[in-house]
A protein has these predicted regions:
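A short, structured beta-strand/loop element
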Residues: 82-88, 92
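Short, Lys/Arg-rich flexible segments
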Residues: 1-74, 92-139
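Secondary-structure transition/turn motif
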Residues: 74-82
Length: 139
């Protein structure tokens, strides 16, 4: 549906709103891929026998809008709280990317490295697609 704007300010506001929605949607798509990679390259690689999974690691994958036009997908180390005081969220993030499960090295994937590869190959196209869905002509 075509819209008519009577000022540059109206046009800018409408375009900013379209961009904000597109960025939010792109972050959601990227977050889903990060969670898929965590499942396939971490959780599916090892079944613990000495501890019960809490899934805090999976749930620490998150997204947020930094500004109206900037979003990020990241692992929030502060969302993890393990019983061992030396095993912090930061330690878990590093260990998981090195295929370490509960202190045991297994043949697993490197979820973060895989996610970075995915983002480098796909994030721009995902954003362009989401901008087009908002009605913006993007090449």
């Amino acid at each position: 549906m075509a819209r008519t704007f009577t000022s540059i300010v109206e046009l800018q506001g409408a375009m900013q709103q379209c961009c904000t929605v597109a960025i939010q949607n792109a972050c959601e798509i990227l977050l889903a891929e990060l969670q898929r990679l965590i499942r396939s390259e971490f959780y599916d690689q090892y079944t613990p026998t000495m501890y019960n999974r809490t899934y805090q690691f999976l749930e620490s994958a998150t997204k947020e809008m930094v500004t109206d036009l900037c979003g990020r997908v990241f692992m929030d180390a502060d969302r993890m709280n393990y019983l061992e005081p030396h095993w912090t969220g930061e330690v878990q993030l590093e260990a998981a990317n090195n295929s370490v499960h509960g202190g045991i090295l297994v043949n697993g994937g490197r979820y973060w490295d895989s996610f970075m590869e995915y983002c480098n190959a796909n994030a721009l196209n995902i954003l362009k697609q989401e901008l087009r869905k908002q009605g913006l002509n993007v090449r």
